[in-house]
Design a protein with these regions (language model features):
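Dinucleotide-binding Rossmann-like beta1-alpha1 core, especially the glycine-rich loop
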Residues: 44-123
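Mid-domain catalytic core of redox enzymes
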Residues: 213-316, 321-330, 334, 359-362
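Feature captures the FAD/FMN-dependent oxidoreductase FAD-binding
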Residues: 62-75, 79-90, 138-144, 201-207, ...
């Protein structure tokens, strides 16, 4: 039996590893292996887009262990903060939050109660509720405008008013794994490229664009296969998406800068930023040791849409805009050793109200499967953990269909 897997990201690599003992598996990838987890090499490896993991990421932790990388796994309590009106405020500890001057004590109390309760809520029950109206009902205009809207605008831009409340509840629950000193997150020391390389070992990976056809049998680039697993974004399926009446899902694009700075911006790992071309500063070397890289490394994260001006403008122009807005953090052009711009056209679905109804099943047609960002494990927020789980579950579905189990 022959199986084609389209996409060598976490979902595709996981599915391939689950199926390789049952069939001849060929993985097709038009870009670098790893997908959104691919890395940049500069004498060391670092992800093109910021990544970290959480204690609850059981699927990811099991995969790291399975591929012998447990010794590389490190956990650290990091600081988070917010930049507003020219100042950076740490919001890492209860004391930090109490000292924050841009919210009243009542606002802070309401926010704390909301954070605690969000951990216990069933996200699916809130799928049809717009996030902005839900927040306005709970907090009124002040907390919505001063705290939530800058983050929603930075993440979703003009689509912020369409996003489901379920997405925010999941986001808050994930990010509320706080200790008294801050938030605990994990990382693979020296980079997630180690996991990608381990998962890709002993797999047949073909670097090529793919044309999938159904003409009696499934074929990829003219070669017949008994089954095809597609792990890419739905728009890249072209006519097949219409043929099988797949849901029309809106995607957002990632525009992320990775920069080397002469000096650290602050001692905070993650700073949410208002009114800038980037929505967050993620200072990687406030998380991992400076000695691993020999330079201060900072991500500047922004989101657009496939049609948006930020995604489509030249990288050089994007770099100029990012560097302009960095000046408010006392970073001058001479302080920047280098900057690289990375773009992903379909980095995440926009989790609009009603998105639950658009989740794609694994089995689309006899011999044709879809898994990835639009699968149930990645609802209502995509993650490395969800992508790995989708890869395992689609493989289990295929094995059951073909009598492998």
């Amino acid at each position: 039996m022959k199986i084609a897997i389209i996409g060598a990201g976490l979902t595709g690599l996981r599915a391939a590893n689950e199926l390789k003992e049952y069939a001849k598996v060929r993985v097709f990838e038009k870009n670098e292996i790893g997908g959104l987890l691919s890395s940049f090499c500069n004498g060391y490896y670092i992800e093109k887009y910021y990544h970290h993991l959480f204690r609850k990421d059981s699927e990811l932790l099991e995969t790291i262990k399975r591929f012998g990388l447990n010794s590389k796994l490190v956990w650290k309590t990091v600081k988070v903060g917010f930049a507003i009106n020219g100042s950076i405020y740490s919001l890492s500890t209860p004391i930090d939050i109490l000292r924050y001057p841009h919210m009243s004590f009542r606002d802070k109390l309401d926010l704390a109660i909301f954070t605690i309760r969000s951990r216990k809520l069933e996200y699916e029950n809130f799928d049809d509720i717009p996030v902005i109206s839900a927040l306005k009902d709970r907090f009124g205009d002040r907390l919505l405008e001063k705290f939530f809207m800058p983050m929603l605008k930075a993440k979703f831009g003009e689509n912020a008013d369409k996003v489901s409340f379920a997405w925010l509840l999941a986001r808050v629950a994930i990010r509320s794994n706080r200790r008294l000193r801050g938030e605990e997150i994990g990382y693979l020391r020296h980079g997630f490229h180690q996991l990608i390389e381990k998962m890709a070992e002993n797999l047949e990976i073909v670097h090529a664009n793919c044309e999938i056809k159904l003409e009696g049998k499934w074929s990829v680039n003219g070669e017949d296969f008994d089954a095809v697993i597609f792990t890419g974004p739905i728009p890249e399926l072209g006519e097949l998406a219409f043929k099988f009446r797949l849901p029309r899902i809106k995607y957002q694009s990632s525009v992320c800068a990775l920069a080397s700075l002469k000096n650290s911006i602050s001692d905070i790992y993650w700073i949410n930023v208002e009114k800038a071309t980037f929505g967050a500063i993620i200072e990687h070397t406030n998380f991992m040791p400076f000695e691993d890289y020999g330079e201060n490394l900072v991500y500047l994260a922004s989101y657009s849409t496939p049609e948006g001006w930020l995604f489509n403008q030249a990288d050089s122009e994007t770099a100029k805009l990012f560097l302009r807005d960095l000046k408010r953090f006392n970073v001058r052009e001479g302080d920047v050793r280098w900057i690289r711009i990375f773009k992903a056209k379909y980095s995440s679905p926009i989790y609009e109200t009603g998105f639950l109804k658009k989740i794609t099943p694994y089995r689309i047609h006899d011999g044709f499967y879809i898994a990835g960002m639009t699968s149930k494990p990645n609802y209502p927020e995509r993650s490395m953990n969800g992508s790995l789980k989708a890869g395992r579950e689609v493989a289990e579905c295929l094995k059951k269909d073909f009598g492998f189990e």
